[in-house]
């Protein structure tokens, strides 16, 4: 359990280092896991370098199904520290190991709240970073800018989702080398600006860069969907750390559209099969290719344009529900009173008056209620294309 002083340091500075928190035997076990699972997940960029040529390589996706990698997900110090700092039960949103090979280039200044990424669009998450070697001058320090997270930028707005004011980029002089060493645990706020130097050593610079979100703050794009095999590699208690998992693929996406009248109303399309939420089969958006597939906002918005003739400025994740042989990723949007008063291709029904027997999937009411549930605190998800022009778009 973290002390009050440690929690205050994290809140004020945006990071906290627990020296030597990860046992040497655990690091060695992780190294064996990496040896058995080459870091080839990458960015899906066809022009990316070929491992192990100079570059930065990613081990992610479903790699945690290997017990020699997955065990660290439920490491007591990591999980308890995340719980203390998030003030909520933590759930894993990303399992990532980076391998920067000799002469691999560094990363420029950035922070990692990103509204298009399953691993970056929760409104309350943190990094748990564990170096497998000393991040020194030769292998490449990870620099942080203390206090640059500026959480006062996050505030309530006129919608059910939180608003975020534009980030303030720190000056070069504000970055420090925190002196990370093998086996340390760096806990880092999602908004903290950081950068990494190139690897000028003759050995690989490897580290664990997992992300945990507060359970009540789902990613705006939806979670990266872990396979059941990942969950089965964990203990019964550890399985609580995986928010969503399945042996099915996400195949469709739909939108819950609500508005407030005398009571909450929900929009449905009237089809031959019954009442259905607008949406359809997914298409993978490849505007910003990366490993954490799961953002189907572009597909959902396309269906809303075609079926409802509306362009929503954002959508936010509700849940994944069975549809056919796959899963349906469902997003939500709440109308305000400023829309132009035209009719829609479909029907608005008071929530209490929806005829359940006419619903196509039977889970629609559950999805609406989850969207309206105030215990979930959401952000505004964007498509990849919307974020190409400004990766820190708010």
Task: Please name every model-derived segment.
Residues 1-13, 19-118:
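Non-heme Fe(II)-dependent double-stranded beta-helix
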Residues 40, 44-45, 192-248:
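Non-heme Fe(II)/2-oxoglutarate
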Residues 119-137, 179, 211-214:
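Short, conserved beta-strand element in jelly-roll/cupin
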Residues 126-128, 247-267, 283, 288-289:
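Conserved N-terminal beta-strand and adjoining loop/helix that marks the start
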Residues 135-197, 217, 229:
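Double-stranded beta-helix
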Residues 213, 250-251, 312-313, 319-353, ...:
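Active-site-adjacent beta-strand/loop module that shapes the phosphate/pyrophosphate-binding cleft
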Residues 262-310, 394:
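Conserved Nudix-box catalytic region and its N-terminal flanking loop in Nudix hydrolases
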Residues 271-275, 280, 340-394:
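Nudix hydrolase/Nudix homology domain
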């Amino acid at each position: 359990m973290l002390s009050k002083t440690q929690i205050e340091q994290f809140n004020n500075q945006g990071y906290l280092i627990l020296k030597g928190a990860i046992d040497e035997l655990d690091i060695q076990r992780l190294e064996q896991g990496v040896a058995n699972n080459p870091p080839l997940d990458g960015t899906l960029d066809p022009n990316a370098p070929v491992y192990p040529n100079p570059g930065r390589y990613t081990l992610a996706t479903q790699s945690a199904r290997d017990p020699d990698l997955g065990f660290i997900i439920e490491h007591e110090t990591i999980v308890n520290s995340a719980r203390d700092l998030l003030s909520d039960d933590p759930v894993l949103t990303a399992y990532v190991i980076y391998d920067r090979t000799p002469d691999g280039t560094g990363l420029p200044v950035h922070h990692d709240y990103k509204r298009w990424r399953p691993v970056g669009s929760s409104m309350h998450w943190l990094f748990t970073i564990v170096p497998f070697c000393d991040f020194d001058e030769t292998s490449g320090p990870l620099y942080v800018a203390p206090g640059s997270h500026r959480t006062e930028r996050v505030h309530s707005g006129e919608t059910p989702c939180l608003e975020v004011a534009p980030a303030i980029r720190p000056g070069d002089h504000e970055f420090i080398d925190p002196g990370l060493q093998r086996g340390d645990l760096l806990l880092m706020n999602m908004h903290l600006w950081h950068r990494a130097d190139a690897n000028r050593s003759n050995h690989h610079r490897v580290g664990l860069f997992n992300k945990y979100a507060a359970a009540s703050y789902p990613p705006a794009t939806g979670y990266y969907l872990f396979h059941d095999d990942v969950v089965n590699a964990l203990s019964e208690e550890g399985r609580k750390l995986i928010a969503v998992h399945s042996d099915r693929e996400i195949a469709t996406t739909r939108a819950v559209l609500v508005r407030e009248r005398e009571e909450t109303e929900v929009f449905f399309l009237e089809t031959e099969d019954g009442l259905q939420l607008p949406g359809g089969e997914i298409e993978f958006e490849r505007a910003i290719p990366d490993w954490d597939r799961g953002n189907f906002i572009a597909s959902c918005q396309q269906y809303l344009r075609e079926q409802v003739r509306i362009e929503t400025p954002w959508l936010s994740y509700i849940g994944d529900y069975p549809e056919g042989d796959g899963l349906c990723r469902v997003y939500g949007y709440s109308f305000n009173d400023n829309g132009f008063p035209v009719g829609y291709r479909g029907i608005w029904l008071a929530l209490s008056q929806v005829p359940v027997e006419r619903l196509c999937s039977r889970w629609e009411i559950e999805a609406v209620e989850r969207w309206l549930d105030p215990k979930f605190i959401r952000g505004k998800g964007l498509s990849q294309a919307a974020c190409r022009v400004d990766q820190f778009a708010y």
